[in-house]
């Protein structure tokens, strides 16, 4: 335990030296004072993917229909709460859409910070997206984009909550909460085969995510053009990170919806097929069929 505490002290000292004093308003909040819980949960997440795939290799895929229904409903409701609370609290604080500092809104800033803590915590809950893929043997959906997005968001938002827990930080989570209401409603409906014929709007979810990232970059850079005291380095980092998501999601969109099929066998997956988190098993099944024909 002494070695663990020493490791914790070293990490926290390093982060404090890098980013400066933490925001005192969030001291003592669950999982924020030490980086270790966030770090170890992320390591466990990555190990679970690797070990889980090995464990499931020679075992049948699990259905998990009931669990997935409850899970998607829970994330949808949490996202709805965060969206409503962020709109109400920023309205109460008179937040400036172009640039909002960290202190001028008083109690409204604390209210925003509390919602953003739930946003941070929800990123650890969303690790279950990938775990469910593993248990259902949906390995084609566990892409670099998927894992990068899930792992990085959880760690980045630990930093956000400690140093910039309100102000300009509100915008991205507000948009993301709205997008997640749509996404997890879609995922929940996709569990039921009878609903598949109504799920023709998958690609529009990806388009909405891309719009979300572009709007977040625009909002972030507006505070660079007209500064209000929000940390400049944080603005540049957030814009750069969002740009990586734009590139990765745009690549996925082009590969999935715009690229011409190589063969007639490889067709656009119909809306009736099961879709989860922007990936369709039917597409990869068709691709494998083409390769198998070539090998014969």
Swiss-Prot record:
Listed pathway(s): Lipid metabolism; polyunsaturated fatty acid biosynthesis
Record keyword Transferase present: yes
The UniProt record lists the keyword Lipid metabolism: yes
Tissue: Liver and testis.
Motif Di-lysine motif location, chain numbering: 293-296
Record membrane topology: Multi-pass membrane protein
Coarse class of the protein's main subcellular location: endoplasmic reticulum
GO cellular component assignments: endoplasmic reticulum; endoplasmic reticulum membrane
GO biological process: one example: fatty acid elongation, monounsaturated fatty acid
Keyword terms: Endoplasmic reticulum, Fatty acid biosynthesis, Fatty acid metabolism, Lipid biosynthesis, Lipid metabolism, Membrane, Transferase, Transmembrane, Transmembrane helix
Catalytic activity: a very-long-chain acyl-CoA + malonyl-CoA + H(+) = a very-long-chain 3-oxoacyl-CoA + CO2 + CoA; (5Z,8Z,11Z,14Z)-eicosatetraenoyl-CoA + malonyl-CoA + H(+) = (7Z,10Z,13Z,16Z)-3-oxodocosatetraenoyl-CoA + CO2 + CoA; (7Z,10Z,13Z,16Z)-docosatetraenoyl-CoA + malonyl-CoA + H(+) = (9Z,12Z,15Z,18Z)-3-oxotetracosatetraenoyl-CoA + CO2 + CoA; (5Z,8Z,11Z,14Z,17Z)-eicosapentaenoyl-CoA + malonyl-CoA + H(+) = 3-oxo-(7Z,10Z,13Z,16Z,19Z)-docosapentaenoyl-CoA + CO2 + CoA
Transmembrane intervals: 29-49, 67-87, 115-135, 153-173, 175-195, 208-225, 230-250
Compartments, as annotated in UniProt: Endoplasmic reticulum membrane
Alphabetized GO MF terms: fatty acid elongase activity
Family recorded in the similarity comment: Belongs to the ELO family. ELOVL2 subfamily.
Entry function: Catalyzes the first and rate-limiting reaction of the four reactions that constitute the long-chain fatty acids elongation cycle. This endoplasmic reticulum-bound enzymatic process allows the addition of 2 carbons to the chain of long- and very long-chain fatty acids (VLCFAs) per cycle. Condensing enzyme that catalyzes the synthesis of polyunsaturated very long chain fatty acid (C20- and C22-PUFA), acting specifically toward polyunsaturated acyl-CoA with the higher activity toward C20:4(n-6) acyl-CoA.
HAMAP family tied to this protein: VLCF_elongase_2
Free-text note regarding domains: The C-terminal di-lysine motif may confer endoplasmic reticulum localization.
Alphabetical list of PANTHER family matching this protein: ELONGATION OF VERY LONG CHAIN FATTY ACIDS PROTEIN 2 (PTHR11157:SF16), FATTY ACID ACYL TRANSFERASE-RELATED (PTHR11157)
Quaternary structure note: Interacts with TECR.
Protein name from the UniProt record: Very long chain fatty acid elongase 2
Organism, scientific name: Homo sapiens
């Amino acid at each position: 335990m002494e070695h663990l505490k020493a490791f914790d002290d070293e990490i926290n000292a390093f982060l404090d030296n890098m980013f400066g004093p933490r925001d005192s308003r969030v001291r003592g909040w669950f999982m924020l004072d030490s980086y270790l819980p966030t770090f170890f949960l992320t390591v466990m997440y990555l190990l679970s993917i690797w070990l889980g795939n090995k464990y499931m290799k020679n075992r049948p895929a699990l259905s998990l229909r009931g669990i997935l229904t409850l899970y998607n409903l829970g994330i949808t409701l949490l996202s709805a709460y965060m969206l409503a609370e962020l709109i109400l609290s920023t309205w109460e604080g008179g937040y400036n859409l172009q640039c909002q500092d960290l202190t001028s809104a008083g109690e409204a800033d604390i209210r925003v910070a509390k919602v953003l803590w739930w946003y941070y915590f929800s990123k650890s809950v969303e690790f279950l997206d990938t775990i469910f893929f593993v248990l259902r043997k949906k390995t084609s959906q566990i892409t670099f984009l998927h894992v990068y997005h899930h792992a990085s968001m959880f760690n980045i938002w630990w930093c956000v909550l400690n140093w910039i827990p309100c102000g300009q930080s509100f915008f991205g989570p507000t948009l993301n909460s709205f997008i997640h209401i749509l996404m997890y409603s879609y995922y929940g409906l996709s569990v039921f085969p009878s609903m598949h014929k109504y799920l023709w709007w998958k690609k529009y979810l990806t388009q909405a995510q891309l719009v979300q990232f572009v709007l977040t970059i625009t909002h972030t850079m507006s505070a660079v053009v007209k500064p209000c005291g929000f940390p400049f380095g944080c603005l540049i980092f957030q814009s750069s990170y969002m740009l990586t998501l734009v590139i990765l999601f745009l690549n996925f969109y082009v590969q999935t919806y715009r690229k011409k099929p190589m063969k007639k066998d490889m067709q656009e997956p119909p809306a009736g097929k099961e879709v989860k988190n922007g990936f369709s098993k039917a597409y990869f099944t068709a691709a494998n069929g083409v390769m198998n024909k070539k090998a014969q």
